[in-house]
Amino acid sequence: MSRTVFCARLNKEADGLDFQLYPGELGKRIFDNISKEAWGQWQHKQTMLINEKKLNMMDPEHRKLLETEMVNFLFEGKEVHIEGYTPPSK
């Protein structure tokens, strides 16, 4: 049976992550407060950020930037701004 959490990003009860995906205290906070759906949204944004800003995950400054964007997106409700990206029209 899947576990449910009150998702801080979506502001609703939703399926929680199956296991802690990120290390440390931040990882515990994500595991306890972020749903699978919100994590999937973050993964999509993260991929766009890495590609568009040409981030190198071996660079500690790039990892810190990505972590800051992740916290802003998941817990503070801020959207990720990707310069030059225009979402497809529906």
Swiss-Prot record:
**What HAMAP family does its record include?**
Fe_traffic_YggX (MF_00686)
Q: Does Iron count among this protein's keywords?
A: yes
Tell me the function of this protein: Could be a mediator in iron transactions between iron acquisition and iron-requiring processes, such as synthesis and/or repair of Fe-S clusters in biosynthetic enzymes.
Question: Under which name does UniProt file this protein?
Answer: Probable Fe(2+)-trafficking protein
InterPro entries hit by this protein? Fe_traffick_prot_YggX (IPR007457), Fe_traffick_prot_YggX_sf (IPR036766)
**What are this entry's molecular-function GO terms?**
iron ion binding
Give the matching Gene3D superfamilies.
Fe(II) trafficking protein YggX (1.10.3880.10)
Q: Which UniProt keywords apply?
A: Iron
Provide the species name: Vibrio vulnificus (strain YJ016)
| An annotated GO cellular component | cytosol
Q: Which family does it belong to?
A: Belongs to the Fe(2+)-trafficking protein family.
Q: Which GO terms describe its biological process?
A: cellular response to oxidative stress
